[in-house]
Amino acid sequence: MAQERRGSREDRQNREERDSEFVDKLVAINRVAKVVKGGRRFGFAALVVVGDQKGRVGFGHGKAREVPEAIRKATEAAKRDLIFVPLRGGRTLHHDVNGRHGAGKVLLRSAKAGTGIIAGGPMRAVFETLGVHDVVAKSTGSSNPYNMVRATFDALKNQMHPKDIAAQRGMKYATLQARRVAAGAASEE
């Protein structure tokens, strides 16, 4: 029987090729302590955002006794939990959207070409790994990086492609696009 063994050279090469397409950003690193009978055991917790800069992004959390191991665990967790976000023109969001997690609230707004990423710390890392070039984001409430990242992902999960919105409303995509163009022209006047 000619079955491939787990951990074969081809398997490792495929995994390395798959991993090389992703960009990862370290969002936060914390020193954590576990209290045991003899005192405290110190370790590290890492929050990492991973994306392919083409619309797929994920975040992960990892804990270990050493920093590199915590980052590796967080990166693997992020790669296991990727979401796809439809982008307009491969550069911005299709529509404005709100997200929240705990006390953290975020507002994400699509922006014109050339605007850049106007977002604070953890949200900026999410947009850079997602592949968004133009976006305006505002976070209120909690400034905890974990809550900000989770609130941003909550908002991104609610992002819908106009074709899906048209299908949901029972109208044609062209009609929806015509309304969008007309609304854009009216707002410029």
Curated annotation (Swiss-Prot):
Signal peptide from the UniProt entry: none
Pfam families: Ribosomal_S5, Ribosomal_S5_C
Keywords tagged on the record: Ribonucleoprotein, Ribosomal protein, RNA-binding, rRNA-binding
Boundaries of every S5 DRBM domain copy: 22-85
InterPro entries: Ribosomal_Su5_D2-typ_SF, Ribosomal_uS5, Ribosomal_uS5_bac-type, Ribosomal_uS5_C, Ribosomal_uS5_N, Ribosomal_uS5_N_CS, Ribsml_uS5_D2-typ_fold_subgr
Molecular functions (GO terms): rRNA binding; structural constituent of ribosome
Tagged with keyword Signal: no
One Gene Ontology term, aspect cellular component: small ribosomal subunit
Job of this protein: With S4 and S12 plays an important role in translational accuracy. Located at the back of the 30S subunit body where it stabilizes the conformation of the head with respect to the body.
Family of this protein: Belongs to the universal ribosomal protein uS5 family.
Subunit structure: Part of the 30S ribosomal subunit. Contacts proteins S4 and S8.
Name of the protein in its database record: Small ribosomal subunit protein uS5
Gene designation per UniProt: rpsE
